[in-house]
């Protein structure tokens, strides 16, 4: 067996991507961590959404958000971002199925960073309603993405959540796992 530097590099790269133990697989575990419904209040998720916002800004050749703008180090509630459910947790327009609650409600595809004021103003209304849709027509590029979907498809359900999740997961893979 060759023990050259290239071989050592390949083995270490493999271990970094696939884990040092069978049960510790960075590719699988990392993706499950950010796509599983039970982790939706984790700080790391806010970080991923912040990085996704800056990824979209960079693609559009726009200035990036600073961490301070996103984490609100100045404790100014008016500019603080909160983790928002695009379709609300307790809607006033529909009753969710058990499957929807388990698979989609807290999915990363249904979560966005939103200011406290807008999150509060949305209440529990349908995100496809005109007044709510307009809240996503903002300076944030991740919101523009949601806004365009809501305007063109006039709904936010399993399909839109899955499509958004897939875009964010692709971003995670491209930036941290490959």
Roles of regions detected by a PLM:
Residues 1-9:
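Single conserved hydrophobic/aromatic residue that forms the stacking wall/gate
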Residues 131-178:
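In a subset of proteins, long, contiguous C-terminal domains/tails are tracked
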Residues 13-146:
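Betabetaalpha-Me/HNH-type nuclease active-site subdomain
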Residues 1-2, 76-79, 150-155:
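Short, exposed beta-strand "edge-strand" segments with a Pro/Gly-rich flavor and a Y/T-containing core
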